[in-house]
Amino acid sequence: MRITQGCFSFLPDLTDEQISAQVDYCLGRGWAVSLEHTDDPHPRNTYWEMWGMPMFDLRDPKGVMIELDECRKAWPGRYIRINAFDSTRGFETVTMSFIVNRPEVEPSLRMERTEVDGRSIRYTHSIVR
């Protein structure tokens, strides 16, 4: 099952040229760019592992692409995403996030419904590999 999280998730995978163009768009607006990776794509897993430090002073997308290549080499079977942060108001806000690397075989999410007290429904999600 294809995981759909972030911008462009319903489109085919972006090429490196398209990724570079999106990073250039982010940098042109003064947003800081960072890379994160995970092997657990569960929607509630919002805290992925950071790859390096956020690139606050970067002006050229080549720096991000070099870091992305290194991250892909280190974690070829993981999800990798690019985040862009806007800190113009004194606090960091994610303005853009998109997946740039996926494992060859993506896991599926299974949802189980359980009726509990008072006819309430409890939902449990698990990953099926």
Swiss-Prot record:
Organism domain of life: Bacteria
A molecular function (GO) term: ribulose-bisphosphate carboxylase activity
Presence of keyword Cell membrane: no
Disulfide bond positions: none
Induction: Expression of this form I ribulose-bisphosphate carboxylase operon predominates when carbon dioxide is limiting.
Gene Ontology biological process terms in this record: reductive pentose-phosphate cycle
Keywords assigned by UniProt, alphabetized: Calvin cycle, Carbon dioxide fixation, Photosynthesis
Gene3D superfamilies: Ribulose bisphosphate carboxylase, small subunit (3.30.190.10)
Keyword check for 4Fe-4S: no
Miscellaneous comment: The basic functional RuBisCO is composed of a large chain homodimer in a 'head-to-tail' conformation. In form I RuBisCO this homodimer is arranged in a barrel-like tetramer with the small subunits forming a tetrameric 'cap' on each end of the 'barrel'.
General function of this protein: RuBisCO catalyzes two reactions: the carboxylation of D-ribulose 1,5-bisphosphate, the primary event in carbon dioxide fixation, as well as the oxidative fragmentation of the pentose substrate. Both reactions occur simultaneously and in competition at the same active site. Although the small subunit is not catalytic it is essential for maximal activity.
Subunit structure: Heterohexadecamer of 8 large and 8 small subunits.
Family listed: Belongs to the RuBisCO small chain family.
Cross-referenced PANTHER family: RIBULOSE BISPHOSPHATE CARBOXYLASE SMALL CHAIN 1, CHLOROPLASTIC, RIBULOSE BISPHOSPHATE CARBOXYLASE SMALL SUBUNIT
Protein name: Ribulose bisphosphate carboxylase small subunit
